[in-house]
Structures are given as C-alpha cells and as structure tokens.
Amino acid sequence: VETILLVILVVVTVTMIIAVLLQRSEGGALGIGGGGGNAVDHMLSANLEGVEFINANTDSQALHRSGVSKVMQLGEGLTKGLGAGANPDVGCQAATEDRDKIAAALEGTDMIFLTAGMGGGTGTGAAPVVAHLAREKGILTVAVVTRPFNFEGKKRIAAADQGIKELGELVDSLIVIPNERILEVMGGKITLLEAFSKANEVLLNAVQGISELITRPGLINVDFADVRTVMSEMGMAMMGSATATGPDRSIEAARGAVCSPLLEEVDIHGAKGLLVNVSAGPDMELAEFAQVGEIVNEYASEDGTVVIGTVLDPEMEGELRVTMVATGIRNRTLTPQITLVKDGEVEDAVE
C-alpha cells in the first residue's frame, strides 16, 4: 500500500518561509522539512532519511538564499516577490492566490506536518489556508507552531495568538511551542542564535519523533494507521523529547519527555492519545521499554489510545531517547513544574 506523507513547515527567523516537503515512495513515504535559514539547515544536517525539501515563500530573495533544492514562489502577482510585510492578511491572500499550486503539492498525500512561526505575515496568514486545503482532501494534519518571544512585541504576539486560534480549528492536532520558554529554561544569557537554534531543535524532534516510527524499522513497529488513530481530530496536543544515559536512562528519558520544558503549559493527564517513540541502540533491554510504557501510561485517560514503537539506531549505543506526543489535551496548567533534562540528569529549573 502506498502511504504518502507531506510535511509543510512555516518558521520565523530573519524572514518568513513556508517550507513544503513532498516525497512519494512505496511503503511509508516521508516528507520532512524546516523553513527559514537555521531551521532548514538544522533539518538538512540531521540527515533525516527519505526527505525532500521544497521552500515556498512570498519573498523571492529568501528563496534564492534557501539551501534546499526546490522552491515555490507564493503570491508573486500580489507581493512582487517582496514578502508579506509582516501582514497576515497579505500572507493569506498570497496563499489563496496560489491555492491550485498548493493543492497540487498536497495531491495524493496522507499526512502533513504544518509547522509555523506564528506572528509574522506569511506563516500566520498562509498556514490556515494550507490547513484548510488539506482538510478538504481528508489529509491527516498535525501543526507544530511557535509563539513569539515577548521582546518581539505585543502586536506580533496578538497576531500569533489569533493565528494559532484559527489554525487550531482546521488541523487534527496542534502543538504550540512558546519561544519565551527557551529564555526561562535556558537562562537569560543565551544568545539570540542559540535561542532560535533551540527552537529549531524542538521542531526537528517533533517531526523526527513521529516520522521515524513509520519509516524506520524497530522491534515494535508503528504504521500510518496507528498514527492516524492517535492524532486525528484530537485538538490540543503536546510534544516532549529527552535523551538519557546510565542505569536509569529509561526512567529519566521518559520523565524528561513528559515534562517537556519548552512547550506550551498544558496538563497532559487524561490525554486521549499518546504516541511514543523509544529510540536506542541494540543494547536496549525489554525492562527499559516496559518502564517507559508504565510512565507514559500514567498520563493517558482510561479510554485513551496509547501507541508505543521503537527505533533501533546503532549510533545510539548507551543512549535512550523518548519522544512523546500527547493528543486530546483538555486543560492548561497555571504553574507547571519545569524540568531541564541534560546528559541524562533531571534538574528542577523553574516552578
């Protein structure tokens, strides 16, 4: 059976870019990508298997600077290649102008990841248009979006919040990554480059954690139908990833993943769906896999669906990584415990 996945990423760095990824192949085909300078480079440097990037942007200069091989100009007649000017209405009009072009890219696709740097013009305005087109085609759509830093201003944050609200009504599952949390968790002395790099890493973890379950072999395999069950029509979602080493690595990685310090403050207890990727070398023990399962099952509702798969990576000898996506989350927390996971150790960072 041919399974086709499409990933569309809209990320803010210096410019706003929509990165559209498309690949077709037998079995479980995969498309993964990132947009905007460091995000694209980070995705490319990760050497994700079976990945093809296509950047689509309203800014023609940004497309020329793009490191990916395929590009798509959006709204050329409207913007003349000069970008959306931080105006979501222009971004929306640009995407609407090229609805047929976007729809053609979506054709035959089973799943997309839509990742947007919300608050700017192209991402905030174009992402809902793409999501709507995907919904019309019955494509499973998972959005992973960033919320601006506070220093980016109230107007940009307000635009982001409106865009997040609109996008949430169109996608199957929505994960929000507030950039401001990076400053809280990593400290105020972090450089701007490091802050955006960390955000790009979270974006990579989200896409990689889900896609690898479908595309890479493991002792316990997960197929596209499993992913659809957990993520279809679920609403608010949360993603966390952590890597640990040592005798308690499975417990530390699982706890670190569910704490998810860089993601939106949500209470995942009672989640309707849990999708878990346990990645490790061939030294992973059955008891470790069971420990991860016990911890993540604490957060699922009684009638929730839990899907756990493994990915074996020979280069991860001695390491164990847990990536978890919790879907169907109902309540936000007001003062969650934030935990920073580093080198296999779990430390309280912010309360």
Positions of predicted regions on the chain:
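Feature marks short, highly hydrophobic, charge-poor N-terminal signal-anchor/signal peptide-like helices
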Residues: 1-11
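Hydrophobic alpha-helical segments with strong N-terminal bias
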Residues: 7-8, 20, 207
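Tubulin/FtsZ superfamily GTPase core signature
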Residues: 32-351
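Hydrophobic core segments of alpha-helical transmembrane domains in multi-pass membrane transport
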Residues: 12-17
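Short terminal targeting/anchoring segments
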Residues: 18, 23-34
